[in-house]
Every structure is written in structure tokens, then in C-alpha cells.
Amino acid sequence: MKILHISNFVQKQNGRLYWNHCFKINNGSIRNGHNLCIFSDRDQSRMNILNKFNDNKILNKNLLSTFINFDPDLVIIGHADKIHNKTLREFKTIKKNLKIIEWNVDNYYLDNTEEKFKKRSDVIDAFFITNAHKNLITCLSENNSISFFPNIFDQSIENMKIFENNNFKYDIFFALSYGVGTGKIRSKKSDYDRETYLEYIHKKLPNIKTNFFGYNNIEPIWGSFFEKSLSQSPISLNLSRKPNIKYYSSDRISQYLGNGSCIFVDINSQLNDLFE
């Protein structure tokens, strides 16, 4: 199968986000024998300054040319908000039997996820999202579906076996990101609930050796530095932005569990259902 994957492949981040879901989907597609073509919407948008002033008209024109040249059987979209529905409709006009699916790893109540799904509902054949909130059904049209999929693990990326270590510098690890865009602590924060939890641990469990990032003026950590720090503790905190909803977790859960760290997760996520 020929697959066109449209997502943010974060070229401007210089490799610090190499564990993102978009890369794991690429890897899985190739391992399963498919011919893959990628299109990075945000990077393509930055390549021509005129996209700032014409609602990404040039970007969408380039995408249409890519579609025509590659002639895919399946189009996969992930967090590609700069792509117009009009462009996706043109895909289906050109190729009647084409299927378009969209994946999303955001909390239903955050980052305009509900609005984004509803906006795409008449052009997407199937949605896949890493939570199971009951209101997701309201985002559908008569001709598509929505399914839960867990955060993706990739053995070529999450390849540490922390559980085999015997000596650790710290007892517990946590990395607060404040979003992947800048990779820096924000002056206007929206994560006080998680910071409060970390402060509670420091006050109530002073003998615990913590290794926390993105907190208490310690900058977030990324790339191979993240992996090295993760490996220095046997346990990790998997704290996601609230509100807690069914089966949702930050995609950091893949890096924690996949690398062999024992994690603590909020019971209100109901993730324990998946292990019973």
C-alpha cells in the first residue's frame, strides 16, 4: 500500500523530539511493507513566508502536487492543522476510493481537540485518539468512525531496560514539558496542579531522592538527555494535564513504560481497565 503521512515532523526542533508518534507511525508502516511518503505541514509552511499571509495557500497547493505525484492508497493525518478541508476533498475527487484517517494524542477537553474533530468530520473516514471520552461520538458524521488507540511504543525508540538496572542515582523521575514548542518553562503556567503534587512529595517524603524537571526553575529536558535522566531512577511519575478523562495519558507514558520504568498514574484515567 502507498501511504501519504501528513503531520508535524518537527524539523525545526533539531532532533529533540525523535520519539514523537508521527515517527513511530512511519516506522510501523515501513516495517509492515508499505511505501511511505511524508509531508511535514508546519515545516513546509515555514519554507515560504507568503503562507503567513495567504492562509497557507502555497502549502496546500504543494500538498496537492505531492498527492498527485505519489498517488497514495491511504492518507494519514496527525495534528496537521494547516491543511484545509478543501484540499482533502480534492484528494477524494481525484481518487474516488481513497481513504483518509486522522490520529490524535490530545486530551478531548484541551488544545481545541473537540473543535478540530468536528471541523474534519465530513472529510475523514476514521479517527483514532488516545482517550475514550463519551462525548467523542458527537464529533462524527454519518460516514465515519472513531476508535481508541493506546499511546504507541516502538522498540527501536524505547529500547532501554531500566528494570534490569541495580544501581540508581535517584528514586523517582518526572519531566514536565509545558508543551513541545519552545521546550522552556513558561512564565504563564497552566500546570499548577502537577507542581502542587511535586511539592507535596518534597514536603511529605523528604528522604525520597527526586529528579524532577520543568519544575522549581529547572528547565524541561529533551532528547537523549531525557533518556539518560530517565534511566537514573527506577520509578517515574506519569502526570497528565487535567481534566482526567477515560484512558487518556500524556504520550510520555510510552517513554516511561517502553523504557522499562515503573510508573505511577492517576487512577481517574481508568487505565487500569486495560490491564485487568
Outline where the language-model segments fall.
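N-terminal/domain-start segments enriched in small and hydrophobic, helix-friendly residues
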Residues: 60-80
